[in-house]
Amino acid sequence: MNNMVNTLKTLPTILGIKMPRHFLMLCIVIFSACTSVAQQNIPKGAEILMQVYPDFVKGYNDGYLLMTDGTKMLYDDGRKKTFLQKLDDGDPEDMFAFKYDRHSWTPEYLQDAGRSRCEPFFKKMYGATEAQVKQKLVSVSWFGEKVLFTPVNGAADSLRAVATELAKHPELRTYLKSSGSFYWRKVRGANRQSAHSYGMTIDIGVAKSDYWLWKNPGRGETARITYANRIPHEIVLIFEKHGFIWGGRWYHYDTMHFEFRPEILAANPL
């Protein structure tokens, strides 16, 4: 912006014309204000994506995320979507449509922050096919087991940090057996990719877990349901500290589920 201001100041000399100083200053003020407004118009969600995924998102311009590989991705398609459409056909903006309430242990109706995953965005980062994801996976030690996890965006290192901290709490050990991490598949009953497909999600303690359909058989996605959870809050807080969201904070709860989604936590700070 400073270069443009200097250009405005020297423009009369370059063109060989006389321009009243007050008029020139007015032009500079207007230009500066317009530039400032343009900078402030970056959606908060886009700013967060740039902050937490710097290896893939380098900027935002004219409604598009600017990716580090030189491509761009529409941030908001402008469509008004139903709850299910945000899950099945979400854009990057839709990922921030729901509240991840870290101050309550009982989710509000239809607040499923993290269940909306823009598939082109996640496939850009983690891999567009099963083979592409698998070739990046690394082994992470998890309480006597080895689980496959992606190192992309620091996810595997974050899981290791979770394990290190949980190891200080032997009383929690019975909840920590892995029930699965990487698994390329669709979400049950839907046509959208499961978060497990990207290798940045782990299920734990299935024997002590609760799932909304287990407790509410036959209920639809927009029905009122009853909540249940047996996973200790201490486990949840440790995962969240290292960038993971918990499926137990969803209205459509899945309490075994921990998913590396630092953008959701950044958008919903404590």
Task: Please give the residue ranges for each predicted region.
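Boundary at the C-terminal end of the N-terminal hydrophobic targeting segment
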Residues: 36-39
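A cross-kingdom marker for long, charged
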Residues: 242-270
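Bacterial N-terminal signal peptides
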Residues: 25-33
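Bacterial N-terminal signal peptides that target proteins for export
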Residues: 8-24
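Cell-envelope/glycan interface and biosynthesis
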Residues: 41-250
